[in-house]
Each structure stands twice: as C-alpha cells, then as structure tokens.
Amino acid sequence: PIYGFVVNRSLFEQYDIPLPTDYESFVSACQAFEKVGIRGFTADYTYDYTCMETLQGLSAAELTTTEGRKWRTAYSDPASTARVGLDDTVWPGAFERMAQFIRDTHLTADDLALNYDDVTGMFRNGEAAMYFGSSAGVKMFRDEGIDTIFLPFFSQNGEKWIMTTPYFQIALNRDLEQDTARREKAMKVLNVMLSEQAQNRIVSEGQDILSYSQNVPLRLTEYLKDVRSVVEENHMYIRIASNDFFAVSKDVVSKMIAGELTAEQAYQAFNAQLLA
C-alpha cells in the first residue's frame, strides 16, 4: 500500500484555497481552513502505525541519505543481536520536524482518540480537508462523489516523498541451503509470489502497487496520477516496521502530540526505549 495525504479537492475550490505544492503551502492551507472552522489536517493517531509513519514520513528525505541508510543497515542487521538505538546525526532532526508538524497542524491530545472511522467521517462531512491515509481512500471517496486526490509528504527541505508498506514479507529457513530439493520448491513458491500475475491478484480493487520486482511493470491507477513524478524520482520510502518501532512510536509520538515531550525529550525517550 501507498500512504500520503488524502485531500478533498472540492473543499479547496469551495474556499478558494490553493492546493499544497510544498510544506509551506501545506501549512498555509491548514491555517486557511482553520479560519473557516475546518480542520486542515488530522489523522487516526489512536493507532501505532499512524504515529510511526508520520514520524518517518516527515523525514523520509533525511532517512534515505547516506547517514540515514548507514543507521538503518545497522538497526536492521539480522546477524546482530545487539540492540541498536537512534543515531545522533539523522534522528534528532526527525523529532524536530515532527514537533514542527504538530505545531503547524495544531494537533492536540484530542486527536489521539481519533480512529479510522472518526477521521474518514470528518473528511466525508467536510469537517477535515486532509488526512493521512492510503491511496485506496481516494477511490473510496470518489465513489461517494467527493472530488478527492492523493498528495505526498512535503519534506521541509523541499522534496516530496510517499510512504510504502509491504503487502507481504518472506523468511526462508537457513536449513534450505543444505536441502537442494526443498530449496528448489521454496524458490518456486517465491518466484510465483513475486510474479506479475500473483502481485496483481493480491492487490485489492483500486489499490496501487509499486513492485520491488524489476520484471513487474509499474502499475499506477488514476488515483495516483498526482504523485507520478514522485514515483518516477524514486522518492518512495519503505517504512521501518520492527515491533519496537510500532510500540515506541505510539508512546513517544502520542506524548509529543499531547504536549508532554519536547523534540529533544522525545528523541531521548525513543532512544532509551530502543536500547532497553
């Protein structure tokens, strides 16, 4: 699935507010909607994955730099049993950007109680102009007659990124290396799962797929046409999704939204929990 911002374009047109093209105009749009009693942005922050993906998505540009990839390689190393915390190069800035985003969108403790139905209900009723969600939401609302588009994360450095999450992940038993027959069977299953036919079958109607297999052509529905350039620039961030990241993101980001932690305190708290 592909995540970013689901946007009610008709609301923008109704109130003559320009669609966002960068972070500054995104913030301006949020402020303009607030003046007419509409939430510019919200999301279902009762869920751990929304907390986690917002934190990472806002810093996708920085997390994919050389330093960011270096940290991620160390954190995700399957051969290492040592606990790895956050680095002191890339991650402090990620919490600064999260804190800035919270201020700019006026997120509060009330948003922590919002679930998916709450947020989509606000969007459907014209009470919220934008929310964090998947491109499937665009189809859902268009089918309901709401002029909806999909926009990327607007990084504060000017870049645009989208968040991707795997449909499935595969682990192969190391013992297969010693059993040729079983290994061949496992690879046959793997090849089928990664084939174009199989990937198109597992994709739900209206949902886009960005395949990591080079032999599967790019498939974008009309709902992603506004971020095609982002895809073509390969600005597709694959989320870090360890069990620790889910749990710690929920705890720390929730406290940031509630105003209980500064960016520095959040960085320290997150790091401490990863190392615990």
Regions found by a protein language model. Give the residues of each.
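A structural signal for short loop-to-beta-strand junctions that line the ligand-binding cleft
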Residues: P1-S10, R39-G40, F154-M163, E232-I240
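Periplasmic solute-binding protein
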Residues: P1-V27, I38, Y45-D77, T164-R174, ...
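Conserved C-terminal helix/tail region of periplasmic/extracytoplasmic solute-binding proteins
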Residues: E13, Q199-N200, R228-A276
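A local structural motif
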Residues: Q14-L19, A99-L114, E127, E144-D147
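Extracytoplasmic/periplasmic substrate-recognition and gating elements
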Residues: Y15, R142-E205
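Short helix-initiation/N-cap motifs at beta->coil->alpha
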Residues: Y23-S28, A109-R124
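Glycine-centered hinge/linker elements that transmit conformational signals in sensory
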Residues: C30-A32, T73-L112
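Paired acidic/hydrophobic, glycine-rich loop segments that form the ligand-binding mouth/hinge
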Residues: A129-S134, I149
